[in-house]
Amino acid sequence: VICLTGCSHVDKTDVQAVITNELDLLKNLDSDTTQKYVSYKELFPDATKEIKLSNEVKEVFSLFFQDFDYQILDLDVDEDKKEATASLRLSTIDAASLAKDYGEASLKNAILKAADSEEQATEKNTDSMEERYLLLDQLLSNNNYATVERECTVELCNKGSNDDKDEWEIIRSHSLENNLVGGLMTYLSDNNLLSPEETLTVYLNTLKTMNTEQMGNYLGIESLFNTSDTDKNSIAAALVELFHSTFDFNISSCDEESYNAVIQTKITTFD
């Protein structure tokens, strides 16, 4: 259903055609159109290293937009100013759930990366742009995310040189990019994406997966876990195995104040 109000039918038909042509390309998973409206740099502006558009990165956008759809709700065209505004209802992937899963997976990867090396340099432990997109690709490939709806406004301008030739173009903006990806940019940049309880849960669950060397590096007891002494290695391996078999936890409460949180947690481990 398309509601058209305000000006001549011809003008609105032209504007409607531009919107339809552009957004249909997104629906058809056109990679050039995807990059025109959603720059791969915008999702992760703080990434440590830029990348060329590999097939894996392009696949992320194909997976993201595979269920994309839209509906034009209203059009308003100002012929004198050569401006137009369209109200749209977008159907996108549940970006909030995707961002939450990404936050948890990214935190787990960061913990394991720190545990894989004795060096704690921030630059070495920060994911590159490619690593972040590969993680998104993994999540989109392995999970089925619901589709959600959101309404947004799209602005257009007429670049035509005279009255005989209309050249309507959609004005690209950060807001439009964010809406087309269901608000994913906003969710990923949210420092409170994971609650304190969720952050602690990821941390403690990740400890359960660490091998002997990782645990030694991460807990700062390399001298016990990383040694050439066969007997010490056997003891360290036995301790890690015992830890894995007995470790458990239960979060009972969380008190937050500003940027700090105190979490009451019952931890079970070996004696």
Residue ranges and their predicted role:
Residues 9-67, 71, 182-250:
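Core segments of small alpha/beta cavity-forming domains
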Residues 55-142, 234-271:
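Surface-exposed, charged secondary-structure patches
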Residues 3-6:
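C-terminal motif of bacterial Sec signal peptides marking the signal peptidase cleavage site
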Residues 10, 163-165, 259:
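Intrinsic-disorder/low-complexity regions
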Residues 1, 80, 205-206, 213, ...:
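Intrinsic disorder/low-complexity detector
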Residues 105-191:
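Short beta-strand edge/turn micro-motifs at domain boundaries
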